[in-house]
Amino acid sequence: LQESTHTTPDPVAVQTLLHDFARQGAENVAMEVSSHGLDQLRVNGVAFKSAIFTNLTRDHLDYHGSMQAYGEIKARLFYWQGLQHAVINIDDPFGAALAGRLKAERPDLAVYGYGFGEQADIRITQFAAASDGMSVALDTPWGSGEVRSRLLGRFNAQNLAACVGLLCANGYPLDKVLAALAQIRPATGRMDCIMRPDAPLVVVDYAHTPDALEKAIATLNEIKPQGARLWCVFGCGGNRDKGKRPLMGAAATAADKVVITSDNPRLEAPQAIIDDILPAVPQPAFVHPDRRTAIEYAVAEASVQDIIL
């Protein structure tokens, strides 16, 4: 693994990486393509065969200006010359509209919708969650099956459905796809569980948008033991979209206990960022700009049965 400073590197780095992969015998590459990458032409010249659309939620409005503009930049990938398969989350309103557009405008493209809804081609028919993972049953054009995963959250069930759609569309057998997906381990810092018998369950997640925080909290509320409390320790980044700060605060109120602290303030004063969050948090919250102090407070105050996000 090599560290990268951007989700999608600059065009020279992208082409260099692909060249090196091919020289080493790689036949397939999975790439996360950011809206910035599409807008700044970082992936021009890349021959994409299949693409997944996961969601459109508030982020990067300091760059794109509006949700509509943000969505249309993401949609560019699905009009890529030579693209053969589009696998789209139709539980997402923009995704559902995009799938409809593509079916009408691109008869050459195989479009598969995935999600919990009845209209999904790759449909999640059953979902059961626990603190150590989840069980997901799927009905697909390639058959039905079930996968037991160590991942957490309905959004990760959707992600598994997306992987099934992309891989099966490319000719991989459903049973082998499900067996492979069962082996996936959570990425560090993404619903990453820290468990000790004498301490509360601590879950570390990257959630830096209102939607992501809302989904992380909903996931943990589903698995929280009866009588236990869910603590949310969070902050917002500096020198980025200020409009999402009160939305993050509002999302955090779905937890039982809220702790507000710093999260990469960059060049802004940490307390100024916190002051932008606080008006949306009606319940009493513990506030401390020092992140270590805030985390230590939550761990010290939580019971063994509690969960800390």
Would you name each region that the model predicts?
Residues Q2-S34:
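Conserved nucleotide-sensing/catalytic segment adjacent to the nucleotide-binding pocket
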Residues D205:
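Conserved phosphate/oxyanion-binding catalytic-loop motifs
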Residues Q84, A228, D306:
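Glycine-centered, small-residue-biased loops immediately flanking beta-strands
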Residues N44-L56, G227-V233:
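Inter-motif core of Ras-like GTPase G domains
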Residues A22-M31, F48-V202, L278-P282, F286:
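Acidic, Mg2+-coordinating active-site environments of NTP-dependent enzymes
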Residues G37-N44:
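Conserved helix/coil segment N-terminal to the catalytic DExD/H
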Residues V281, V287-L309:
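C-terminal structured "cap/appendage" subdomains that terminate the fold
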Residues P186-G189, D211-L213, A218-Q283, R291:
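Active-site beta-alpha connecting loops in nucleotide-dependent enzymes
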